[in-house]
């Protein structure tokens, strides 16, 4: 008799991240995820002790993908500091990672442990920006201001609905980044 096939851990994590991105942590429920995957809840408990452990694993995955993997890829692909800043922003706030990032930011307003984790991630991102922008500008105050503006631009862009007098958002963002990195 063959052993039962278990839904791989990565499948549960991918489904959990999609649920988190779509509806925040309240949308990450075991039974609906199992139904969406066409499996029973039992497979979930083979991989995760409980929902809290699963949520922690989702946060671990988000943190690894949005920092470790992004920074490693940016460094591996190389380029000058301006190229690296742009690439880091595009990867960090990609179609895949942005919805998760925004959900984690919202969640962090209600959960201190999530807020601490978000602070750690943002501190790593800011440290990387400081390093890259510091290679372009020697003045510490200028580096700090430009790093904060670049990071704020990348996050805030997704909350601004304004139009740009005949220009596309992409054109205005590129103009803003050129000025920040000049």
Residue ranges and their predicted role:
Residues 1-7:
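N-terminal intrinsically disordered/low-complexity leader segments
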